[in-house]
Amino acid sequence: DIFEYVGRDEAYLDVTKRVEGDFKKASHLARQIKNKIREELKLSCSIGVSSNKLISKIASDYQKPDGLTIIEPNKIEQFLKPLNIRVIPGIGKKTEQRFKEMNLETIEDLKKIDVFTLNKEFGRKNGTYMYNAIRGINDDPVKEKEESIQYSKITTLKKDSKDHEFLLENLQGLCKQVHDVIMKNNKMFKSIGIHFVQSDLTNKSKSKILRNSTNNL
């Protein structure tokens, strides 16, 4: 088995060899895992089982907080068709709003758009990803957790200030710099934080773990 830790409440498990590609065996194993978690931790969990990480993730979210959704390869298209575009990992509020402006709300709607239009609207990388994702195509392997990479930018203001617009302008500038680095390195992120030092040298910070990985800052 290959275990990939994603966050404090999310992980992927490749059990292809253990279950010999049999979805009935995979379903039985998933129920065993759910029961074990309930017995030992007194917690419920949602599990999605499918042929790749993308569909497994969507299936896991489908019946939260205590569901088990099995999507075999020949049922992927039928499963995805009525779902809202937002269920695709990486599609955030801004992208969803852009699709609404194009009168596109479901995955079935979005499948009417060709890859060239998506690439023109969202860039080649994102456009191609979305074109494949809505068709259930994903070859991202389950892999052991890699060492976390942190991207950050820091600045010292020319003057102390409580002016919201002034502070926001500087923050947006830092966000753009970090975003440019992320795009240059072809990375995605799932956690984001801000750290600042006040005029009396006290420190404050705030961080958040996102629902899905994204490259949109």
Regions found by a protein language model. Name each.
Residues 1-129, 142:
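Gly/Gly-Pro- and Ser/Thr-rich, intrinsically disordered tail segments characteristic of DNA damage-repair
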Residues 100-217:
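DNA-contacting surface of Y-family translesion DNA polymerases
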